[in-house]
């Protein structure tokens, strides 16, 4: 169960991470504290997912660096445009046998609330439930700053579906190695 939760979290972050490779050096850091991020897949029979993230400047940069750098290596196009308070990111990235072309529009403030609208098109790779091959998918994210992190949270903690994990631990094995 924990491994599936990690996989789902990583999938969501990498899907959103399509904006990170192009924007990692350009996006301002989010305000330190507790953020709630609601992810909604549009036009697919997938329930909305809400996650909370306790961040500070270091863990926000770590997230951008980990997911942004990994994805950047796989992207042939990364274009970012800033117009006032709107950031637009276009990218073409290859992951295994799949090529993902994405367009993201980011609005709002990284101090209080922001919205990310992502549309993407996949070519190749395994089929996704509810998505025709080559079909477009849409996802929206709404990030809201809730205040200070709870006393039992440390920067990098993410809570999704009632389970807590830390961004620093995502690459670590779930089960300790056998002696």
Task: Please name every model-derived segment.
Residues 1-13:
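Bacterial N-terminal signal peptides that target proteins for export
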Residues 48-49, 98-103, 136-140:
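Short, surface-exposed coil-to-beta transition loops
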């Amino acid at each position: 169960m924990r491994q599936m939760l990690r996989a789902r979290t990583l999938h969501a972050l990498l899907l959103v991470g399509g904006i990170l490779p192009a924007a990692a050096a350009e996006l301002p850091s989010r305000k330190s504290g507790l953020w709630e991020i609601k992810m909604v897949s549009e036009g697919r029979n997938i329930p909305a997912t809400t996650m909370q993230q306790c961040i500070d400047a270091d863990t926000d940069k770590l997230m951008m660096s980990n997911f942004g750098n990994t994805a950047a290596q796989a992207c042939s196009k990364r274009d970012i445009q800033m117009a006032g308070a709107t950031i637009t990111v276009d990218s073409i990235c290859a992951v295994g046998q799949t090529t993902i072309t994405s367009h993201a529009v980011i609005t709002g403030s990284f101090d209080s609330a922001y919205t990310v609208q992502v549309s993407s098109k996949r070519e190749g790779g395994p089929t996704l439930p509810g998505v025709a091959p080559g079909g477009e998918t849409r996802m929206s994210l709404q990030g809201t700053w809730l205040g200070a992190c709870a006393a039992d949270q440390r920067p990098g903690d993410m809570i999704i579906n009632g389970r807590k994990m830390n961004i620093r631990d995502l690459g670590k094995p779930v089960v300790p190695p056998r002696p």
